[in-house]
């Protein structure tokens, strides 16, 4: 499978970013925002060779004159016309023609059946792929960490899931979805920075706040104590230079922002916190496998990149379980891309080659084939 010509393509379509590349590589070759922008007024961009849609970085750069849409919300595709993203991925980013390569796509846990069929249909009918497969994101993250059993706390820009997996199979009845994710944290940080007197409201400033969040935020092991420390000393303060050269100082906001993960009530959300969701998910599983799940809590997704999150998670879950139970939280260093890396590993296994859905099988059975072969 080392031959570049028939190397499978692995494409992880996230709410915030699309990550794409070739199976066997250790990192995705293309990572760009999952945004599709359409001109607000036709004819504004005179002489620019008007395009009807801009994707990814180009849409980001021209955002002043475009209406930006995220075709994927909360991890689930809701605008199929805007899945232009795929076209862009194959032709502009990877520079391959999809009819020459098998394609491995990822999907959110609990993805509606109609969505899986639609993905399958587009791949075979629009792109004429020779073969394709749809894998669940959390399972791929677990593979990337070298395990087949564990519970994955997968959290991205738009949605979080806790997914228990036993011997490579998800346990659907115990999957929990949290609509608490990166975007909510960016909103919260915008709000608490406003309290400090920095007005950041536009969509361009929102990107700045997201950058502040990614560079400076961290999770406190003991929130109350950290607040005391922040009041009495300036040890938590950091400065951040804005694009216009203005320097702002950020103190307790650094850990008040991700604290929402552990106390959603801070932003008025009634959802369970990440550690409660993980615990609830495990409690829905068979009593015999709980020990294996507590010992393999794997964090995945860009939203889990905050320093200190693994220790805090471990502390919070430990406080909920019997003292004899050993809790281990694993935070792989490259967890931002672990879904993609897991896909790359899976698609290059020799045993996986009989798992692909081929064009022939699709022609014979129709889109429903995806439920028979991908589970």
Swiss-Prot record:
Catalytic reactions of this protein: ATP + H2O = ADP + phosphate + H(+)
SMART domains, per the entry: ACTIN
Pfam families reported in the protein's UniProt record: Actin
GO MF annotation list: ATP binding; hydrolase activity
GO cellular component assignments: cytoplasm; cytoskeleton
E.C. no: 3.6.4.-
Keywords of this entry: ATP-binding, Cytoplasm, Cytoskeleton, Hydrolase, Nucleotide-binding
Compartments where located: Cytoplasm, Cytoskeleton
Leading EC class: hydrolase
Function, as annotated: Actins are highly conserved proteins that are involved in various types of cell motility and are ubiquitously expressed in all eukaryotic cells. Essential component of cell cytoskeleton; plays an important role in cytoplasmic streaming, cell shape determination, cell division, organelle movement and extension growth.
Other remarks on this protein: There are at least six actin genes in maize.
Family, similarity comment: Belongs to the actin family.
Name used for this protein in its record: Actin-1
UniProt lineage: Eukaryota, Viridiplantae, Streptophyta, Embryophyta, Tracheophyta
Gene coding for it: ACT1
């Amino acid at each position: 499978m080392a031959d570049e010509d028939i190397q499978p393509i692995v494409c992880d379509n996230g709410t915030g970013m699309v990550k794409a590349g070739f199976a066997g590589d250790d990192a995705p070759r293309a990572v760009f925002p999952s945004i599709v922008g359409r001109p607000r007024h036709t004819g504004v961009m005179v002489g620019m060779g008007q395009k009807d849609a801009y994707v990814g970085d180009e849409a980001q750069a021209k955002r002043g004159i475009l209406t930006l849409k995220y075709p994927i919300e909360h991890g689930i595709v809701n605008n199929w016309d805007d899945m232009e993203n795929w076209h862009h991925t194959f032709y502009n980013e990877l520079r391959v023609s999809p009819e020459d390569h098998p394609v491995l796509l990822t999907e959110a846990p609990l993805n509606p059946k109609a969505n899986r069929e639609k993905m399958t249909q587009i791949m075979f009918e629009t792109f004429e792929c020779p073969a394709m497969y749809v894998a669940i994101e959390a399972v791929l993250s677990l593979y990337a960490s070298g395990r087949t059993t564990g519970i994955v706390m997968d959290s991205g820009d738009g949605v979080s899931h806790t997914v228990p997996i036993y011997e490579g199979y998800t346990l659907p009845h115990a999957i929990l979805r949290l609509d608490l994710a990166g975007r909510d944290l960016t909103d919260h940080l915008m709000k608490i920075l406003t309290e400090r007197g920095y007005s950041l409201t536009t969509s361009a400033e929102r990107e700045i706040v997201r950058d502040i969040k990614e560079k400076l935020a961290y999770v406190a092991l003991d929130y109350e104590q950290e607040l005391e420390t922040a009041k009495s000393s300036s040890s938590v303060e950091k400065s951040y230079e804005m694009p216009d050269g203005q320097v702002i100082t950020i103190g307790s906001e650094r850990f008040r922002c991700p604290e929402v993960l552990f106390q959603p009530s801070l932003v008025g959300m009634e959802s369970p916190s990440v550690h409660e969701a993980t615990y609830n998910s495990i409690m829905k599983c068979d009593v015999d496998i709980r020990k294996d799940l507590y010992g393999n809590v794997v964090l995945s997704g860009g939203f889990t990149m905050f320093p200190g999150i693994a220790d805090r998670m471990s502390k919070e879950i430990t406080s909920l379980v019997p003292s004899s139970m050993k809790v281990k939280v694993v935070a792989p260093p490259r967890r931002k891309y672990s879904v993609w890396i897991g896909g790359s590993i899976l698609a290059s296994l020799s045993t996986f080659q009989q798992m692909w859905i081929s064009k022939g099988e699709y022609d014979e059975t129709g889109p429903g084939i995806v439920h028979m072969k991908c589970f």
